[in-house]
Amino acid sequence: MNQTNFGFKKVDYTKKQGLVNNVFSNVADKYDLMNDLMSLGLHRLWKDEFIRQIPNLNSHILDVASGSGDIALKLAKKARDRVNNISLTLSDINEEMLKQAKKKAIDLNLFQNLKFTVASAEELPFPDDSFDYYTIAFGIRNVPDINKALKEACRVLKPMGKFICLEFSKVKEGYIKDFYKFYSFNIIPSIGQMIAGNKEAYEYLVESIDLFPSQDEFRIMIKDAGFEEVGYKNLSGGIVAIHSAYTR
């Protein structure tokens, strides 16, 4: 029986996605608030830097593990302000999270040119060579088979399409590393209990971050999936990193 990690626990590979779905379904309505509290608002700056990696908004963009839609809606607003003809597809395996994204899109009057698809990052329901950009923010570490998801990203991108991934990473500096580890394992789950009423969900979160490959290890995984010009940029001392690559 194939096993994989669900946080620090070993679980049957076929059960991981259901467990992850339960985590996000249970915290969907507090997801955005928790992001602000856990990151002290830094996630907004990280995401702003992330979308700057997309210079051409007259494009077909796929946002995978879209969650509550932060990345896609930032792009949609930027495109609207610049009168660009953007086509955005928001994909997430968790329907409850996509419902949050749809609600936000309606509230912000950004629903035009958006498509919503419930789908696994491992099996995307799109033809080969469909998109100019593939974005995924804080989602790839939750996928049961990351290598399979990376190959799917390569498949659905057009030639010279760009893959961009924002993910928690490995902190380099010692004093920041020590504080970050203490904050992650002691403070974040407590905030999760107080705000979302779910300590276990945020214990999973910090455990999944701790187990995620280093910047260089993930760079090799992206390259092995078939991408070229693979690189990364650390933000906030390596708390997160933006990974980018191109298809052939």
Swiss-Prot record:
CDD domains reported for this sequence: AdoMet_MTases
Keyword S-adenosyl-L-methionine: yes
Binding site for S-adenosyl-L-methionine: S68, D92
Pfam families referenced in this protein's UniProt entry, alphabetically: Ubie_methyltran
Pathway participation: Quinol/quinone metabolism; menaquinone biosynthesis; menaquinol from 1,4-dihydroxy-2-naphthoate: step 2/2; Cofactor biosynthesis; ubiquinone biosynthesis
EC supergroup of this enzyme: transferase
Gene Ontology MF terms: 2-methoxy-6-polyprenyl-1,4-benzoquinol methyltransferase activity; demethylmenaquinone methyltransferase activity
Listed EC numbers: 2.1.1.163, 2.1.1.201
InterPro entries xref list: SAM-dependent_MTases_sf, UbiE/COQ5_MeTrFase, UbiE/COQ5_MeTrFase_CS
Single Gene Ontology BP annotation: aerobic respiration
Keywords carried by this UniProt record: Menaquinone biosynthesis, Methyltransferase, S-adenosyl-L-methionine, Transferase, Ubiquinone biosynthesis
Keyword Transferase among record annotations: yes
Family classification: Belongs to the class I-like SAM-binding methyltransferase superfamily. MenG/UbiE family.
Function: Methyltransferase required for the conversion of demethylmenaquinol (DMKH2) to menaquinol (MKH2) and the conversion of 2-polyprenyl-6-methoxy-1,4-benzoquinol (DDMQH2) to 2-polyprenyl-3-methyl-6-methoxy-1,4-benzoquinol (DMQH2).
Protein name according to UniProt: Ubiquinone/menaquinone biosynthesis C-methyltransferase UbiE
